[in-house]
Amino acid sequence: MKLKRTAILLLLACGISMQASAAGQNDYSSYYTNMPVQLAQVSAPSIPDYRVSVRDFGAKGDGVTLDTEAFTKAIDAVEAKGGGHVDVPAGVYLLGPIELKSHIDLHLDDNATLYFSPDAGLYEQKENAKGTRGRLRSAISAERCIDISITGRGLIDGMGNYWRPVKRSKQSDEEWKTYVKQGGTVTKDGNFFFPKAPEGMEYDALEKLRNDLIRIYRCKNVLLQGVTFQNSPRFHVHPYYCENVIMDGIVVRSPWNAQNADGIDLTNCRRVLIVNTTVDTGDDGICMKGGQGESGRKAGPVSDVLIKNCRVYHAHGGFTIGSDCSGGMRNIVVRNCTYNGTDVGLRFKSGMDRGGKTENVYCDSIFMSNIKGEAIIFENTYVNKDVKFMLGNGTDIDSTKVFLPDFTDVHISNVVCRGAETGILLRGIPQAFIHDISFRNVIISEARKPYSSEYAKGIVLDNVLVNGEKPKL
């Protein structure tokens, strides 16, 4: 009874305020009150008032005509005027890849739906394209732009079911039959289905080329507001080396079993605000990525990030740091968020080949239920094959030559979780302890396994109850 009363009081004290997204909002300073660490604040992009409609440039929106050229002409025309809004009226638009330009807002009206063609031949990468690792073009991309946005109440669909490999074990019989009817290849062991690849390409080669739905590379002043992003070939929303990014009131979703279908990934980004957003997807929900190895270290940390008033349903992690952390993670606040039915609630993962340091990370007022795995996990056991081989043979790892994970200075407070396989799991390694992590006012109930810790030190447990008992360090 005491546990129940404490949980109710904590919910009342820290209750979520799911603020309504204000269309065209320019001032986001109110989200930064009472921060546990000072964060550099975001500011909305500046978009001129000039407007055009894609219909004026020949877009049909009939779901049959390929409207890529009309969208490109509209964007180019607005760019020539110094920027403005490209309006997409209600309709169903079939598209190949489109590229945003500086000072442009792509605005989707109610009932405007963008479907991106599954024809891989449309997505061949531009010569010398940066940050793509040889992958095909994303459905919507921007490179080195300033002041860009995608806004409105429309829907953007990547038709990822024509791109993603499928595990038989994750499909019902009817789902499996539907995929096979699309045309493609089932592996000899019957465990995987690969979509049909372009002529002359091996069936599994397309898997290495599929790209993100939205990929924004080295851009400044970015706003995504109100739009639904779904069914991506790979990651859904992926700002990469960007600064001053706002995601306000967006929805990101895919089938629960979609391969590598991360919801939101921030790769080495600075000054980011994610608010009033819902994610329900097949891989990590909202994820911080700091790059791997030397390239990640050179790119610098993910820093000055505020995630507030967000909901995550199915995902591998509600909020995730890693596994790529080499650039580091600094000044990150997650507040007033709900995770329901995720595999893991708060997930911190890395390994010896991709580690980096966390600094000033705060997760506060987090409410979870029906967590399939761990409510909270820190793990340093993501390793590549070479490192795993060396560890298995007892080789002494030279910490100066590998990128050791360093999960420290993380503060988790005011958490309520009902239902989890494991309450809290800390899994370090001899070369990299989990250390100096604080848990305050954490209540986890109905966890099959309460608490487990190895290679961890400096752990503070203040008013922490798992299944009504204090965990033993």
Q: Residues of each region from the PLM?
A:
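Short, small-residue-enriched loops and turns at beta-alpha junctions
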Residues: K60-D62, G293-R297, G327-G328
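Extracellular beta-rich repeat passengers
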Residues: C325, G345-L473
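Right-handed parallel beta-helix
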Residues: D110-N111, I146-G154, K220-Q230, E243-P255, ...
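Short, surface-exposed basic-aromatic patches at helix termini and helix-loop junctions that form
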Residues: I98-H107, Y240, G327, G355-G356
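Extracellular "leader-to-stem" segments immediately downstream of a signal peptide or signal-anchor
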Residues: K2-D87, V92-D105, D109-R218, L223-Q225, ...
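Residue-level marker of regulatory loop/turn positions in helix-turn-helix DNA-binding domains and
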Residues: L206-K208, I216, P239, L266, ...
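Short glycine/acidic-rich loop motifs that flank beta-strands on beta-rich extracellular proteins
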Residues: G83, L94-I98, S117-P118, M159-W163, ...
